[in-house]
């Protein structure tokens, strides 16, 4: 389904409350290596997604021009917030022994919250644009990748805003237990091929993504679907590649830094324990599928 789309109200909350009161009265914020299992705790208080630096409250009316105007108005702010958050959040992971952090919390309301970040390196690729194009290919075809790699039934509805500038889409995913989850997402991509002083001054690419809170035209269906919200950021940077004997010259290394906050809302309909567990287990699966898709696409072109 492809229709034109635009947007209407946005409020940005730029501060993040980091004081988490756990059952033991302790704060949480530990990172794990790639091989370590993610932590999951019961919390009595969790910094709401509304206070996350990557989150902007976005409400959509039925008017296409208003929808578009609001998204375009917040685009640059979203890109800047994404870039600066990644620089601050992923700095502690910039070492071989610590490239991944995944913290999960179950709220008193029964929601599952996940705060995570990771660093991936695509070594010996042709260019920054090659990896950026692979990221955008995944974004434009994610329902195919999710269906193939997760074995779920995925459907994506596209509400075009501005090609290569702003994208709005809804993804509906049904797992093997017959439980359906939905996400309504807006994405702001940009490739700074020549660099920009506001984004580090060196060539880079930024992708800021956020959830839609309310949509008068395409409302959530909480009595039938589990709502999945995500406020995430991706930054790509490029560096010189050291070739091995079998490689030619002119290749580069592209580093992807990702961070975000995700929430699975408590289902408002009957659901089996197995079905709910599968939904919870898949909270970060989309990110893993993205990396697999990008690697496959980039290295098949070498």
Identify the residue ranges that each predicted region occupies.
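Long, leucine- and charge-enriched amphipathic alpha-helices
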Residues: 25, 29, 35-38
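Intrinsically disordered, low-complexity regulatory segments of nuclear proteins
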Residues: 5-7, 39-43
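Eukaryotic low-complexity, proline/serine/threonine-rich intrinsically disordered regions
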Residues: 2-12
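Eukaryotic helix-grip
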Residues: 13-15, 19-24, 31, 46-302
């Amino acid at each position: 389904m492809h229709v034109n789309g635009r947007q209407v109200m946005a409020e940005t909350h730029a501060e993040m409350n980091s004081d988490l009161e756990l059952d033991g009265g302790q704060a949480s914020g530990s990172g794990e290596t790639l091989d370590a299992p993610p932590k999951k705790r019961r919390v009595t208080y969790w910094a709401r997604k509304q206070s996350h630096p990557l989150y902007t409250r976005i409400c959509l009316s039925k008017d296409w021009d208003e929808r578009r105007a609001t998204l375009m108005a917040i685009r640059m702010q979203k890109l800047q917030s994404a870039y600066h958050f990644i620089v601050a959040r992923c700095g502690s992971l910039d070492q071989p022994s610590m490239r991944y952090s995944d913290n999960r919390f179950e709220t008193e309301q029964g929601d599952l919250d996940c705060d995570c970040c990771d660093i991936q390196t695509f070594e010996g690729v042709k260019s920054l644009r090659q990896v950026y194009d692979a990221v955008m290919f995944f974004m434009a075809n994610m329902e195919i990748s999710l269906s193939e790699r997760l074995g779920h039934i995925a459907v994506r509805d596209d509400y075009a805003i501005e090609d290569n500038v702003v994208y709005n889409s809804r993804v509906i995913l049904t797992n093997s237990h017959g439980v359906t989850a939905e996400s309504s997402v807006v994405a702001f991509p940009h490739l700074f091929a020549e660099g920009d002083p506001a984004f580090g001054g060196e060539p880079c690419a930024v992708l800021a993504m956020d959830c839609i809170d309310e949509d008068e035209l395409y409302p959530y269906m909480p009595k039938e679907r589990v709502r999945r919200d995500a406020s995430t950021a991706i930054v790509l940077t490029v560096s010189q590649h050291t070739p091995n004997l079998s490689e030619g010259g002119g290749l580069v290394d592209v580093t992807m830094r990702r961070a975000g906050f995700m929430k699975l809302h408590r289902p408002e309909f009957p659901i089996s324990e197995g079905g709910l567990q599968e939904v919870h287990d898949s909270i970060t699966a989309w990110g893993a599928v993205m990396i697999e898709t990008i690697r496959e696409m980039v290295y098949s072109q070498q």
